[in-house]
Amino acid sequence: MLKQVIKTVSSSQAPKKYFFKQFCTSTTEKKGRVGLVTLNRPKSLNALSDGLISEINSAVKLFQEDKDVGSIIITGSEKAFAAGADIKEMEKVTLPDAYNNDLLAQWHDLTKIRKPIIAAVNGYALGGGCELAMMCDIIIAGEKAVFGQPEIKLGTIPGCGGTQRLIRAIGKSKAMELVLTGNNLTAVEAEKAGLVSKVVPVEELLTEATKMAEKIASYSQLTVAMAKEAVNASYELTLQEGIRFERRMFHSTFGTHDQKEGMNAFVEKRTPTWHNK
């Protein structure tokens, strides 16, 4: 469904833009070497319904398979990245329903994507929206962005990694405060706490995210994937285990064409030509 291109725009100044078929609750676009997924449920502030999560997964999987795409951006609207899970879908779910159907399990498919994903966050990133942003590899925030895990106000707790990823991003005390009080972080507070990579003016968010995504996509996709895997391994390994894993990954790069090309280009003072192998 997503593979059908419906419009192509190009110019001598700008990279080609491919507009893919619009889903019910999101749109996808390929801008040069960057895949862009835009959440589009404005009436619900991009509440993350099962359908929207399914569409996000479909889009990023397509971009994962596209050899011309080196990085991916997920964004929402100026008012909301995603204001949370779709409570209307959840309010009547019973314990047997949640357990037997493994409620929210499909959300974690995003973390299986090997290409880097940048969350470009404007407005609300609350509950599931904050968790979605944290599943991405880098978070860039517009200056009016708001982050939080307010599930406690609904009589429940974060269910898609909020209690686990938040503590790794900002430490136990601050994570515990947000989860137990339902308080929010402003964009500046989130950057100071380490949740966000950088804060930019609202109108410059997508431009800055695209600039970063393009820079990442300009490198060897193979090496970038290896670097992402090495950094993510730190979540699961002890320091010494992680250092050994990193060293093995480092050694592995010497078996790639792109390592040879990169070092040869450096010595020869030229721009490398990557072959992603």
Curated annotation (Swiss-Prot):
Its main location: mitochondrion. GO terms for molecular function: 3-hydroxypropionyl-CoA dehydratase activity; crotonyl-CoA hydratase activity. Pathway: Lipid metabolism; fatty acid beta-oxidation. InterPro entries: ClpP/crotonase-like_dom_sf, Enoyl-CoA_hyd/isom_CS, Enoyl-CoA_hydra/iso, Enoyl-CoA_hydra_C. The keyword Mitochondrion applies. GO terms for biological process: fatty acid beta-oxidation. Substrate binds at A85, D86, I87, K88, G128. Pfam families: ECH_1. Straight-chain enoyl-CoA thioesters from C4 up to at least C16 are processed, although with decreasing catalytic rate. The monomer is folded into a right-handed spiral of four turns, followed by two small domains which are involved in trimerization. This is Probable enoyl-CoA hydratase, mitochondrial. It comes from Dictyostelium discoideum. The lineage of its organism: Eukaryota, Amoebozoa, Evosea, Eumycetozoa, Dictyostelia.
